[in-house]
Amino acid sequence: MGSVSLSDIQVTPLARIATDGGDVMHALKKNDPDFVGFGEAYFSWLDHQKVKAWKCHTEMTMNLIVPFGQVRFVFCDLDSEPEVFRIEEIGDYNYSRLTVPPGVWFGFQGLKVNSSLVLNIADIPHDPSEVKKLGEHEINYNWS
């Protein structure tokens, strides 16, 4: 894994097509430019104002989508002094996919009253040995 920058995170607006029976929501196509492979897809529920932070995948490319709710993703460059952050909010009001390369520290927070749902379409199956973790307060970011 080479050096990674917060600018390497891709934001792709996604189609949300209204139909009589309910919306059709696109996620990821094999021929999308940022598709690098399929290993696993999994969902994570996130309660209102709750935070899940901080993680860094050393091998996994994540494709993060919020099909229900609204979520603030905070990405951090720990090599900068002081730390540099990039914030992306996706979901009901900005239906998009975030493609995050390996080596980026991140956390996320639920913004919708009740719950939000995050989908990760990863290029490899989940492997706990390739994940680094820090506690929520170990990176100096104010979630309020």
Residue ranges of predicted features:
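Non-catalytic, conserved peripheral segments adjacent to functional cores
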Residues: 1-97, 111-144
